[in-house]
């Protein structure tokens, strides 16, 4: 590996890994569950890099040995041929390992391990847009099942003809944000609605927002900025005074963000859920502002996370999904069943390629 800066990074990672391993055996740490979990998680995040680096080091030693055998076997054509073959195989293996290590050393998004709130809003297209929003709720719920993630419906506004005007899902599990962060944007569908008698293709949209979950330490909300009213779970209004008002309608006055939460059984639980959603929305706004502030710096071609960015078109007639950031098509029927892993991995790969190109450019100018 010619790049000395990569070797320096790998040696630093290996040293950190060994130090974490040592600390995990410390009685003061083993007796502190919180600290033990934090250190174990940090160590686990470095394990793949360290293991790959060890394989690379061993392969380098093997390559030196194979080259030495090749050099000394001039009088033994058969042995020389075997040594030449081993040299070629090891050089190919080392090149692959170096590609893997370069990717493993890329800066990690600190949000990647977060759980998320996934908000889907019907866009243009009337009733069909709401039905499409409902289809996307099912798509992401099915995908979450394949990942062994836990999905909860936090808030919903159902449409008269089916689907949702708006729905917010909470998705919990391993590396949820890292996989779903590229889903943010406008999802356009082209299909013949069930209600369309003439068979004309309609175009509708739904907007997806991916909001990492945050706690009250990360986002401070002044209680004076909150306007909160309660209603029965069926919605505001009505005359049934005997039914407990469990629904919560919350407005954040500085931003105008409104959250209506009805899914929990008690008013207290709905209030906590509404505040949880509000924190995520405010944090998402902060992230969007930061992205705008660094517009002169790198912006991923895979997507800025902007809600106004059209990222995909789902064409039912041609059984085709087009991801406009990738300029790539996928089979639609699998996608609708929640099989979006190939699309997600393609987005991750493109993002990695961009980061690698940026890293190489930075080294050239250093």
From Swiss-Prot:
Modified residues (N5-methylglutamine): 239
InterPro entries given in the database record: PCRF, Pep_chain_release_fac_I, Pep_chain_release_fac_I_sf, Prokaryotic/Mito_RF, RF-1
Record GO terms (molecular function): translation release factor activity, codon specific
Any Gene Ontology CC annotation: cytoplasm
Assigned keywords, A-Z: Cytoplasm, Methylation, Protein biosynthesis
Residues in coiled coil: none
Membrane spanning residue stretches: none
Cellular compartment(s): Cytoplasm
Coarse class of the protein's main subcellular location: cytoplasm
Disulfide bonds: none
Record's comment on post-translational modification: Methylated by PrmC. Methylation increases the termination efficiency of RF1.
Record-linked Pfam families: PCRF, RF-1
Functional summary from the UniProt entry: Peptide chain release factor 1 directs the termination of translation in response to the peptide chain termination codons UAG and UAA.
Family to which this protein belongs: Belongs to the prokaryotic/mitochondrial release factor family.
NCBIfam families, alphabetized: prfA (TIGR00019), PRK00591.1 (NF001859)
PANTHER family for the chain: LD18447P (PTHR43804), PEPTIDE CHAIN RELEASE FACTOR APG3, CHLOROPLASTIC (PTHR43804:SF8)
Protein name listed in UniProt: Peptide chain release factor 1
Organism: Microcystis aeruginosa (strain NIES-843 / IAM M-2473)
